[in-house]
Amino acid sequence: MSGSVIHSQSAVMVPAVYSAGQPASLPVAIDYPAALALRQMSMVHDELPKYLLAPEVSALLHYVPDLHRKMLLATLWNTGARINEALALTRGDFSLAPPYPFVQLATLKQRTEKAARTAGRMPAGQQTHRLVPLSDSWYVSQLQTMVAQLKIPMERRNRRTGRTEKARIWEVTDRTVRTWIGEAVAAAAADGVTFSVPVTPHTFRHSYAMHMLYAGIPLKVLQSLMGHKSISSTEVYTKVFALDVAARHRVQFAMPESDAVAMLKQLS
C-alpha cells in the first residue's frame, strides 16, 4: 500500500481540529467585523450565495463532538466539494504525502449533466475528476487520525452483490449529514452561538469559494477547484466579493462645499 494515500500506519495523533488550545488567529487576514457587515449587505439579494466566514465554520465544528462527523463537514469546508462528491470519497482518493497533499474529487454534477444528454450509462473511465490541494495541516492530520482510530478499510465486501469494492469513508446519506448539521447548529444555539445564514451541506461549498477569494485565489483557478463547467457559475461569488473590494477602497464623494465653489471660481 502506497504511503501517498491515507493509511493507519501514518496517522499522527494531534489535538482535536480547531481546538481551544490553538492560537486564536484567522487563517486568512481579513477584517472580520467588516466582512460580517458586508455579508449582511449581500443577503439582501436572494440570488447571491449564502456563506459562512472562517471563524463561524470553526465555531460550528466545535459543536460536532464526533470526529467522523466533524471530518466530513471539515472536508466540505476544505475542498468545496458537493455533498455527493464528498460522500463518494474513498481512502484512495486522498494523497497526503508532503509537500502538496491533495484529494481527487469526481465532478458528479458534470457527469450527471452529460448523462442526461446521452442515452445509457456513461462509459467507464470517462468520469470527470478534479484535484483539490489540501493546504491546511490540521485538517490533514485529523483526517489521518480519524482513519487510524476508526480503522476505515481501503476495500469492503458488498453484502448485496458479494463483490469487493472500494470502501467509502462516510457510508451515510445526504439526509444524515443534514441531521448532523442541524444537531450542531442546535448545540451551538443552546450555548449562545447563532449563525446568521441557514447552514446546509452546500453552505460549506459557498464558504470555501468565498474563503478562497479572500485569500486571493484567481477566478479561473477557483473555477477549476470548484468543478464549474462555466466561468459564469464561479463569477457569482465575485458579486459578493465586489462589495468587500468596493467598501475597502472607502471612495469619498463629498468635499467641503465652500472649497468646491472656490476651486471652480479659480478655474473660471
Curated annotation (Swiss-Prot):
Annotated GO biological process: DNA integration; DNA recombination
Gene3D superfamilies noted in UniProt: Intergrase catalytic core
PROSITE patterns assigned to the protein according to its UniProt record, in alphabetical order: TYR_RECOMBINASE
Gene that encodes the chain: resD
Function summary: Acts as a repressor of transcription and as a site-specific resolvase that cleaves at the RfsF site.
All residue ranges annotated as the Tyr recombinase domain in the record: 47-250
Entry protein name: Resolvase
InterPro entries: DNA_brk_join_enz, Integrase-like_cat_sf, Integrase_catalytic, Resolvase_Rsv, Tyrosine_recombinase_XerCD
